Amino acid sequence: MSKGPAVGIDLGTTYSCVGVFQHGKVEIIANDQGNRTTPSYVAFTDSERLIGDAAKNQVAMNPTNTIFDAKRLIGRRFEDSVVQADMKHWPFKVISDGGRPRLEVEYKGEAKNFYPEEISSMVLVKMKEIAEAYLGKSINNAVITVPAYFNDSQRQRTKDAGTISGLNVLRIINEPTAAAIAYGLDKKVGSERNVLIFDLGGGTFDVSILTIEDGIFDLKSTAGDTHLGGEDFDNRMVNHFIAEFKRKHKKDISDNKRAVRRLATACERAKRTLSSSTQASIEIDSLYEGVDFYTSITRARFEELNADLFRGTLDPVEKALRDAKMDKAQVHDIVLVGGSTRIPKMEKLLQDFFNGKELNKSINPDEAVAYGAAVQAESSLGDKSENVQDLVLLDVTPLSLGIETAGGVMTVLIKRNTTIPTKQTQTFTTYSDNQPGVLIQVYEGERAMTKDNNLLGKFELTGIPPAPRGVPQIEVTFDIDANGIMNVSAVDKSTGKENKITITNDKGRLSKEDIERMVQEAEKYKAEDDVQRDKVSAKNGLESYAFNMKSTVEDEKLKGKISDEDKHKILDKCNEVISWLDKNQTAEKDEYEHQQKDLEKVCNPIITKLYQSDGGMPGGMPDGMPGGFQELGAAPGGGSSGPTIEEVD
C-alpha cells in the first residue's frame, strides 16, 4: 500500500469535489477550469470521451451520449422502482444486463455499454487527475463518501468504482459524518452533541441527525427527498422565462432542447448570482429563431417561484427529529452542506425553524463533505489494519429490525442502516385483560406488515400478573454487537421477569442477493404500504375525533354553556359517523377525510361559539387522543388471537 498523500473525494450526484490534507490544513483542489467542484458527467463523442465541465458543457448537442446521475443507479437493480422512475427523465439509454442496469452509448461510431460503477470510476479518475496535477505526484489512496442511507450493495459498488479508477479506497464514510468531521464537531469536549446535517445539493436533499460522543458517530435518523435540489430551483426559473419569452415574442421554445439547455445554463448562473445580489440579468444571443433574449430577475421573484419547494425542506427536518426522538431545542449544531444552502431564503427558513440558532456555514457548503473526507483520509493512512478498513462497509444493519405488534404490524426498533454496535429499548403492553404472557416475534425487513418480512426468531415471556389490558409494561431491548450478533430481551417491569433470544448473522439472516431483492421490493411496495398506512391513520383520526367530540359535549362542565339543540346536533352527527365507521372499516383515505370534513363542518361553528362565549373549553380541543401504549398479544392459547403487541408512545 503506497504511502503517497491520501485524498478525500465527495462523489456527488451532480457535482464532485476533492480535497487533500497537507501542511496542517485541508486544501480543496480546483480543476483545470478553475472550478473547485466538477460536474459528475461523462460524455462520449465520435472522437473522444469527456469528463466533468467539458462533458456538461456539450450536453445540449449530445444528450443521448452524455451520462450523469450514475449515483442514482450504482448498486441498484434494473427493475428497482427508483431506477424505472428515473429512466423516464434521462435522455440516455439504460438497459438490463441480467438484472443489473447498464448504460448504452455510441462512442467513436460504435455502441458501447457501461455499468454505473464504471461511469463513477471515470469521474473518480478525473478527481484523481485534478489532485495529481495540483500535488505534482501520483495519488493512490482515497476516502470516498456516500449518502447515509446507502445500503451495503451501493457502498460496495462505490468501493468497486474506486478500485476500477486505480485508487486504494481506505474507507467509505457517510456524507453527514464527513461534514461533521469538517467542522471538528467530533473534537469538541464535553458530553454528547446532537448534530443536524442539512444537505441540499444539486439533485438530492438529505437531512441526517448524528450524536457524537468521544469521537464516536451514531447516526440517529435520516430523511429527505432524493429528487429535490438546485436543479429543481433552476427549472422553476426556466419555466418562468419560457413563459416570458412566449409573452414578449409570441414564440414557444419549450420543444427546442438546445434553446432550453442554454436557458437552463443561464438560469443556474443567475441563481448563483442571486445568493449574493438582489438582482441578476440574463443575456442570451439568438436564443430561438434569431431572437436575442435579454431580461432580469430579482431575488424576491426567484424566492416566490420556489416558495413551496423551500418551505417543503422543513418537513424532512421535522421527520428526522421525530425519528431521532429529539426536540429541535436539543440540537447542538446545525451544519449546512450543498450549494443550495447558500440561498439566503433557505438559510433564513432553517434558522427561523431553529429559533434563530447560528448555523455552521464557515466552510464552503459545496466543499464541506470533501473537506471532512480529506481529514479522515489523513487519519486513515496511519491505520494499516485491513480489518478496520473493511469494517466500515459492514458496520450498519442492512435491514430494519423489529417485533410484531397488534394487527400484524411491524414495529421497528432498529432502522436499516443503523451503525452497529447499537442498542434500542421500547416499552410495550398487553392486548387483553389478565393476559398471562406475551409472544415476542423478531422480524427483519422494510414492509409495514410482518407477514411481508423475514422472521428471525421468537420467544415467550410468561408469568405476567393479572391486570387490565394496557397496564403491564414490558420492556423490549434489541442489542446488536459489532459482529452483528443480536440479543433480544423482554422484561416485565412489575416482576423483573426476563426472557431472551440470541440471533447470529448467519442463522435465519438473508444473503446479500436476498437483501438487495428485499430492499428493492420494499421500495417498489413502499407506495402501497404508505397508502395503507395513510388509510389507517385517516380512519384512526376520524374515530378519535368523533369519540372525543362526543365526550366533550357530554361533559358536565359544559352544562348551560351549550344549547340542547347544538348538543344534539353534534351527538347525532358523531353517532352517525361512528356507525358509518363500523360498517366501513376498509374505506379509502379520502372517504375518511370526507367524513371528517363533514363532521368538522357541524362541530367547528358550535365549538368556536363556545370558545368565544367562554374564553376556552375544559380539556382543550378534541383533536385526536394521545396514543396509549402499543399492545403485545398473548402467546397462542393465552386468551388472545395471536401476538398483538401495543406500542407505548
Curated annotation (Swiss-Prot):
Looking at the keywords, is Acyltransferase present? no
Q: Where are the transmembrane segments?
A: none
Keywords of the record, alphabetical order, are: ATP-binding, Nucleotide-binding, Stress response
UniProt region (Nucleotide-binding domain (NBD)), positions on chain:
2-386
Question: Region labeled Disordered — which residues?
Answer: 613-649
InterPro entries registered for this protein in UniProt: ATPase_NBD, Heat_shock_70_CS, HSP70_C_sf, HSP70_peptide-bd_sf, Hsp_70_fam
The coiled-coil segments of this chain are: none
Query: Residue ranges under compositional bias (Gly residues)?
Result: 616-627
Q: Which GO terms describe its molecular function?
A: ATP binding; ATP-dependent protein folding chaperone
Q: What is known of its domains?
A: The N-terminal nucleotide binding domain (NBD) (also known as the ATPase domain) is responsible for binding and hydrolyzing ATP. The C-terminal substrate-binding domain (SBD) (also known as peptide-binding domain) binds to the client/substrate proteins. The two domains are allosterically coupled so that, when ATP is bound to the NBD, the SBD binds relatively weakly to clients. When ADP is bound in the NBD, a conformational change enhances the affinity of the SBD for client proteins.
What's its job? Molecular chaperone implicated in a wide variety of cellular processes, including protection of the proteome from stress, folding and transport of newly synthesized polypeptides, activation of proteolysis of misfolded proteins and the formation and dissociation of protein complexes. Plays a pivotal role in the protein quality control system, ensuring the correct folding of proteins, the re-folding of misfolded proteins and controlling the targeting of proteins for subsequent degradation. This is achieved through cycles of ATP binding, ATP hydrolysis and ADP release, mediated by co-chaperones.
The similarity comment for this entry is: Belongs to the heat shock protein 70 family.
Kindly give the NCBIfam families that the UniProt entry links to this protein: PRK00290.1
- Put simply, this protein is called Heat shock cognate 71 kDa protein
The gene behind this protein is hsc70
